[in-house]
Amino acid sequence: MLRIFLTFLLFFCLSSISNARTINWLAHDFAPYYILNGQYQHQGRDESIISLLEKQLPNITFNRMLIPSGKVIQELSNTSNNVCALSLYKNDYRKEHIYFTDESSTTGLSPSIAMHKKLAKALNIAELKEVSLLNLIQDKKLTLGVSMSRSYGQEIDTLINSTPNIDLVIRPTRDSLASLTYMLNLKRIDILLGYPSEHYYLAKSMHFEENLTQRPLTESPALSYGFIGCTKNEQGAKDIAILNEQLKVIKKTQAYNDLLMRWLPEDLRPLLKSRINSTK
């Protein structure tokens, strides 16, 4: 009888070990999506959404791995890895090398421009009014700041790369937006391209929020979607299937929707809500 019990116990333990699951998440130092230190540590949008998924999956261990932001796609594309990342842009090329969820993991406003409030007033650009980036850089001759090697969508990328005789200031990607925000506050550049939550977080953390404002662009789509991506192998396929189902669950919660709004300025939150509601 004891032998039977011990055999059963051994089988149970081995089964538990074989069924133990871990999802390895790639995180990177890119506020306000991941905030690794300072006053707002661990209050990043993407890291908080991962925590919501973690609560939904108590039987799966979530392991966070910190890597440079420029290496995320490279690590995901390596089939010898078993890793996932949140809020990725999905295109045909990436889908050849990475599994993506059908459900979006994040929804946000598309790229906008930040500028001095005094400049917005001088140009008579009302709050929340969409402006044309082409008009600002070609007709108004404003100096535009951008981060090097970063995509802002096909239309904006093409506009920047193909418009002749524009005044462009480019900074390397690491901490480039913070550097450009500092330049914007000093009026060394006129306008700065980025995502609304990034503009808001940097202005707030650098104590420039009283000086700076932002406007949506006519060249940007209404919304920007991010998806979970996992390594394109057997384990990645299983992880994607599980995470896709859990996204359906958390996206119905108030906690999730609050996270989408966390790093948006108050005046842009109704705009995001209305645009999300219009897609339902």
Specify the residue positions occupied by each region the protein language model found.
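Ligand-binding cleft/hinge of the Venus flytrap
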Residues: I50-N59, L133-R174, A203-E209
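Acidic, polar ligand-binding/catalytic clefts
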Residues: R64-Q138, P216-S220
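Extended ligand-binding regions for polar small-molecule ligands
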Residues: E47-L57, K117-E130, L134, Q138-D139, ...
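Periplasmic-binding protein-like
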Residues: H28-A31, T107-S112, M206-N244, L268-L272
